[in-house]
Amino acid sequence: MDLDLSETQRLLQETVRRFLEAEAPFDRIRKLEADQGWDAGLWEKIVAQGFLGVAFGEAHGGSGGRLLDLGLVVEEFARRAVMVPILEVAVAGRALQACSELGPSRVPEVLAGALVPVPALLEVSDRFGDVQLEIAPSGTLTGTKHFVDYGQHATHHLVAARDGGQEAFFLVDARARGVSCEPLLSLGRTPVAVVHYAEAPAQRVGGEGGVAAAIRLGRALAALQCVGSMQASLDQTVAYANTREQFGQAIGRFQAVRHHCANMASRVTSARLLALEALSALDRGEEADVRVAAAKAAASRSAPEVLMLGHQVHGGNGVIEENDLYFFTLRGKERSLAWGSVEECLAVMADRVDEEVDWL
């Protein structure tokens, strides 16, 4: 499989990177962290730039790109540690686009920024795919969803619930009666909430395996968020090793430091390739549960190790929050748990260990 990026994809990467460097300085992100908020102003500019529409069909107002292109965008956002729900809205929007009922009619609103939906999937069991919440005959939802990223800032929640014993997606106005959000303090300092629904009005937008598909996409993109955090840490660590002097020379000239940087680079590269391969499989229409789980397991296992190696090279200088390194350490560790930890993803692979695959 050829995973070399095309000229257009490299241009997309560079465009997103330059945009974020100009529009999302780290001091601005620090203030948002302190306020436990999200960057609504930056989100408006992101919508205007069309970055969100990369992986949506032209009929819905998108640019007709691939999921691989979306993954490149998500990685760049992770490399800047910005406080916007790019992954969450992309997953919810793609789920709406795939729905056979009312979902596709709402996608143009998502791409225009009028609708900011985020997935609400996890329940008390904290296991993806374990959906117990049921829609009432009156068309309302009563129950709780846990760890809803940006749940308190979204305009709508795309809630996974059961309808007649089958999983389906329901769109709930986050400001409607019966909806209350309980903000949580997260490891990565990104907004997350427990959302309580008390006879909240809900509109069915589709089913037919949409929940499982959303989990696969979210998991693959979360792997690239891990990669983005690791790459940012690697870049900063190499730059520091080349400028920090000890014993009359840059510490990057010492073999032990070089080994740390080399180990970081090899982990980042392998995790990125697995994640891009998983997205390519999803682009081809495969369910790709094993590929996606392998990508997320690798990224989730590598992230804490790579990020800690970065801190070892930085020494005490990497501990203070005036150093930007902490952005990526906290976000990377958080993303390593989001959408499936190492253990959860390995369990997915173990459940399918006897299935035939075409890539071994």
Indicate where each model-derived feature is located.
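Alpha-helical interface subdomain recognition
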Residues: 1-80, 99, 113, 140, ...
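N-terminal glycine-rich flavin-associated loop
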Residues: 83-101
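Short beta-strand-to-turn element immediately C-terminal to the catalytic PLP-Schiff-base lysine
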Residues: 96-100, 159-162, 171-174, 196-199
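A short, Trp-centered hydrophobic/proline-enriched beta-strand micro-motif
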Residues: 112-125
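A generic structural signal for well-ordered coil/turn residues at beta-strand boundaries
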Residues: 115, 129, 153-155, 166, ...
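A short core secondary-structure module
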Residues: 120, 144-178
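Flexible, small-/acidic-enriched active-site or ligand-binding loops
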Residues: 128-132, 147-149, 173-204
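Cytochrome P450 C-terminal beta-domain/meander region
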Residues: 128-142, 286
